Amino acid sequence: IGEKRELKKVLEKYWAKQTDFNEVKYVAEQLKKRHWNYQKEAKIEFISSNDFSYYDNMLDTSILLGAIPKRFESLKDEELYFTMARGNETCVAMEMTKWFNTNYHYIVPEISKNTKFKLNSKKVIEEYKEALDLGIKTKINLIGAITYLGLSKSVDNSDAFLHINNVVEAYKELLKEISKLDDEIVVQFDEPLFVKDLDSKVLSLIKPVYDGLSSVASNIKI
């Protein structure tokens, strides 16, 4: 959010209709550059991209995977993003709940048996290129498929993990795009769900999911 809470302040201006989204984007770009350069100067070996968020990384992942609840389907771009998080006069916001045992709250994905996944890789690809323009090769951070589905909410009592193959296919498509960005790229899948006591069904997904993702491109290290 910035040392002086720059992101928070510009977002509040934007939500109050005191500025447009171009100023928000400008502040975000400056923060990302500053933070990447801090890490470069500190000689950090693996500097991350796609860890920045305007609001929440789980919300970013829902946008990435195209998991958009039906009530938001008429919206797009930043209006879609912030309405999913905050709601508006006609659309109820998505639920927020605690991220494990922390005081941080995330936007809970809404999944049903009819959920369709469609990759939207724009943020991931653009942030990698932004860092590369500064001479910084980043590792790309992503929330893993198992954690994403495991922390989602079923709105029709269906099993979210019925979609595991669809989510993995979206991630495979993303990895193919990522593989074209550089000769060698590190991708980090965060799976904090693995700290929990998982049932055998979920445990049985880990090997096939990551065997499949690891086989997509020889120049990607997961």
Feature map (PLM): residue ranges:
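Domain-level signal for soluble alpha/beta catalytic cores
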Residues: 1-222
